[in-house]
From Swiss-Prot:
Claim: Transmembrane is one of the keywords in the record: yes
Function description: Essential cell division protein that stabilizes the FtsZ protofilaments by cross-linking them and that serves as a cytoplasmic membrane anchor for the Z ring. Also required for the recruitment to the septal ring of downstream cell division proteins.
GO CC term (a single one): plasma membrane
Signal peptide annotation: none
Transmembrane segments: 2-22
Disordered: region residues: 66-143
Name of the protein described by the UniProt record: Cell division protein ZipA
Length: 290
């Protein structure tokens, strides 16, 4: 049976229709489970940008999270006292006994004169702060050291007739954390850098009782006196232990002899007696507060 042109056209049409139906069925099946996005026609007129299209059409990327970095301009201004403390943190390799961790929560009070000038738009807030500082000023002035009831003294007397030489004495006490300060004598603060409250002090046991750093090379003394006042540091027992360690170090390294306040030999029993005096003083102070 011969197939005419008409029959061939019918067969070809059926094949085309079947192909279209099959392709549509394949597309519908392949589109299942995919999210459909409705394009906004308002973006149709935007200029093409290869960089942006790559961001939009490309695969999802995991962006690494980075902590914000700060340069020196981002950092808040600090007072001169804080700057000195930070410089003090970069101490050179000097032998030390270590700082007392007496109160981790304690922060040094900022000096109002060191504060930065406020910006002009914030005059209202700055006035409020100044008023608060003025209100606090009397309380700060009132927080003066209380009168001393007792003084614990440890004398270190040189065994050599030439006494303690200035340079060696200075090196020794600096290693123990004492720093030259008020009244031209040395003081041991909470921090080895000379910050914080005074724990104890060291004076020249020979009149006039002071030290001359300008002439320290020619200086010598037969004895020095370590002393701790009560009431004084917030933790007097720990401060006393540091004072005993500094006195023993000086006596051991510079050939000295430890004496008590009566110039008698300082024994272990005498040291325990000093500690008991501290305990008794603390007990009396608590009783008075009640």
């Amino acid at each position: 049976m011969d197939i005419g042109l008409r029959e061939w056209l019918i067969v070809i049409g059926l094949i085309v229709i079947a192909g279209i139906l099959f392709d549509g069925w394949r597309r519908m099946r392949g589109g299942k489970g995919k999210l459909k996005f409705k394009l906004d026609r308002s973006f149709a007129n935007l200029p093409d940008d290869d960089g942006d299209s790559a961001e939009l059409l490309g695969p999802a990327r995991v962006v690494e999270h980075r902590e914000p970095s700060f340069d020196e301009q981002d950092l808040p201004s600090v007072s001169a006292r804080e700057g000195k403390e930070r410089k003090g943190g970069k101490r050179q390799d000097e032998p030390r006994q270590g700082d007392l961790d007496l109160d981790e929560g304690m922060a040094l009070e900022a000096d109002p004169s060191d504060a930065a000038e406020p910006l002009e738009p914030r005059k209202g807030k700055s006035k409020g702060r100044k008023e608060k500082e003025r209100e606090k000023a009397p309380s700060v002035a009132a927080a003066e050291p209380a009168p001393v009831d007792e003084v614990l003294i440890i004398n270190v007397i040189a065994r050599d007739e030439s006494g303690f030489k200035g340079p060696a004495l200075l090196q020794n006490i600096l290693e123990s954390g004492l720093r030259f300060g008020d009244m031209d004598i040395f003081h041991r603060h909470e921090s080895m850098a000379g910050n914080g409250e005074i724990l104890f002090s060291m004076a020249n046991a020979v009149k006039p009782g002071t030290f001359d750093l300008d002439d320290i090379d020619n200086f010598s003394t037969r004895a020095v006196s370590f002393f701790l006042g009560l009431p004084g540091p917030r933790h007097p027992k720990q401060a006393f232990d540091v004072m005993v360690a500094a006195a023993r170090k000086l006596a051991h390294e510079l050939n000295g002899e430890l004496k008590d306040e009566q110039r008698s030999v300082l024994t272990a029993q005498t040291i325990e007696h000093y500690r008991q005096r501290i305990i008794d003083h603390e007990r009396r102070s608590l009783m008075q507060k009640r």
